[in-house]
Amino acid sequence: MKLTHIPLLAGTLASAFSFNTFASDIVSVQFSDGRPAVTGVEAVNNALNPIGVNVVTVDIPEAARPLLAASHRRALTKAEHGALIAAFNLSQGELLEQARLAGRAPAVQGGGVATEETGVGPYPKVYDLMALDERTRSAVLGKYGRMHVNSAEDGTDIDEVMTVVSGGPFRWGFTLKDGSIARFQIDKVGLQDKAVRISYHGLGMHAGLMDAKQGLLVAFAHGPRAFTMRYQADVPHAQLLGTNPWADVGITLPPTPSKVQ
């Protein structure tokens, strides 16, 4: 489908972003090479912008607040997922702006279309950690928690925009230009906090750790019509693909699903 505005809920505020000092204590980056950790949006972006990754904070629309409160007690319904996507909707222009802020040209000129992981389903989608049983949680950790890239069969990159709107922590690993790993973390987003949005691209090697018991993430991805998640690819520092970026800090991961390339 073409990326256009999803009709917003009545009374929903536009999802404006800002560099909010109140997020200073919930976003941070630690480095695998032992350099000092950094905290706060500005410092995080100084570390991650060189690899095309950018972080902003986002005002919570009033219409979304009852959903976020409910997410602390139970898994949300499919209809509530749709309402949450509408509340945090991003138009094609807004998605392109996220890439621009990260210093990237879009993977597909003009932004392309809402993409989907082959065999998994299309974006946008909601990751609701309260909805995961132990078997599913293990599969999610084993799949997304290892370093990987996302690309179409012809090698086309994708653009990804993830907004943590409740709960956590949520963690990502990114490969820096020198081959070290930057471990980005969004600590728990509370009901009175702003959401945190991160933009990155699929061929920038990364991993995502969603091991919290409660949390909501609204995910957009765009570019080609479909992509595949890969643990083997001709990219810089390819020897890191499939590895666990949190192994040296004592976090173990389940086995990798065999169907992932």
Task: Walk through the language-model features, giving the residues of each.
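Conserved SET/PR-domain catalytic core that frames the SAM/AdoMet-binding pocket
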Residues: V189-H206
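Active-site region of the double-stranded beta-helix
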Residues: L48-P50, N54-L191, M210-Q261
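Bacterial N-terminal signal peptides that target proteins for export
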Residues: M1-L8
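Low-complexity, intrinsically disordered activation/interaction regions
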Residues: D25-V44, L48-G52, L68-A69
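Boundary at the C-terminal end of the N-terminal hydrophobic targeting segment
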Residues: T21-A23
